[in-house]
Curated annotation (Swiss-Prot):
EC number, as in UniProt: 3.6.1.27
Family per record: Belongs to the UppP family.
GO BP annotations listed: cell wall organization; peptidoglycan biosynthetic process; regulation of cell shape; response to antibiotic
Alphabetized UniProt keyword annotations: Antibiotic resistance, Cell inner membrane, Cell membrane, Cell shape, Cell wall biogenesis/degradation, Hydrolase, Membrane, Peptidoglycan synthesis, Transmembrane, Transmembrane helix
Record protein name field: Undecaprenyl-diphosphatase
GO cellular component: plasma membrane
């Protein structure tokens, strides 16, 4: 992989990470087209994706810097220094607990099924296309049944747990981490913007942990040129990711996610046609 390819993949990562259309699906499609996904070492591609996600995580930290700082300081004050009972804590401190609670399922499943996630099965276009369609339809259903009444201040532990388990489904390529969590948030009655904001905050622990872990393990097989490519891709994903967050939050204040539903189903259908008609894998 050269720097230009890395920049293009970083751009794709940043543009698709926060839209509910699956960054993994688009990156894997682009990677296969470029010929940089190794059939002999699929774990190298998994590591590349996980590490450049640190760029999009940086975008979340920068965009939500005030929220993250407020949650962190309030959480420390009310839990460490004042040692308040949970029911007496502010919604800001409780939100910190909800992010922790919602992160536990994906941390557990991610470690248990790490080998499967890194294997060739998760690079299969059949798996990716099926996930695009199935989870796209679920997103469409959530738009129909959602009440759109719950703000960020009204999120409960049950909401956090449901969205957290939905994040586990994002381990399936093509599902989309933002897609599954926003879908779950809508099913739980959140407004579209609230579902997206909580989804983005929930991404911080999961993406940081997986990215740093994969980066540590990738040191065993990366050369100096690989580091330059990785750094370029990560920086590009941070810039494009920041712009995508700003766009999506504005978009969801006035529009539904139906355009993404249609896109997912059409893309998934096209991929299935390519697989069965032309034998593309």
């Amino acid at each position: 992989m050269n720097v230009l390819q890395g920049l293009l993949l970083g751009l794709i990562q940043g543009l698709t990470e926060f839209l509910p259309i699956s960054s993994t699906a688009h990156l894997t499609l682009a990677g296969k087209w470029m010929g940089v996904v190794s059939a002999e070492h699929p774990e190298h591609w998994t590591a590349f994706i996980a590490v450049i996600q640190l760029g999009t995580m940086a975008a979340v930290l920068i965009y939500f810097a005030r929220d993250v700082l407020d949650i962190s300081l309030t959480f420390l004050e009310e839990n460490v220094f004042r040692r308040m009972r949970f029911k007496d804590q502010s919604h800001v401190s409780k939100l910190g607990w909800y992010v922790i609670l919602g992160s536990l399922p994906v941390a557990t499943f991610g470690l248990v099924f790490k080998k499967v996630i890194e294997g060739s099965l998760t690079k299969s276009l059949i798996v990716i296309s099926a996930s695009l369609i199935v989870f796209g339809i679920l997103l469409g259903v959530s738009e129909v049944v959602a009440r759109f009444s719950k703000s960020i201040k009204r999120i409960s532990w049950l909401d956090a747990l449901v969205v957290g388990f939905a994040q586990v489904m994002a381990l399936v390529p093509g599902a989309s981490r933002s897609g599954t969590t926003i879908t779950a948030g809508l099913f739980m009655g959140m407004t579209r913007e609230t579902a997206a904001r909580f989804s983005f905050l929930l991404s911080i622990p999961a993406v940081m942990a997986s990215g740093l872990l994969e980066f540590r393990e990738s040191l065993d097989f990366m050369g100096s040129q690989d580091f330059l490519v990785l750094a370029s891709a990560t920086l590009m994903s941070a810039v494009s990711g920041y712009l995508t967050i700003a766009f999506l939050l504005r978009f969801l204040r006035r529009h539904s996610t139906n355009v993404f539903v249609v896109y997912r189903v059409v893309l998934g259908g096209a991929l299935l046609w390519m697989v069965f008609r032309h034998g593309v894998v």
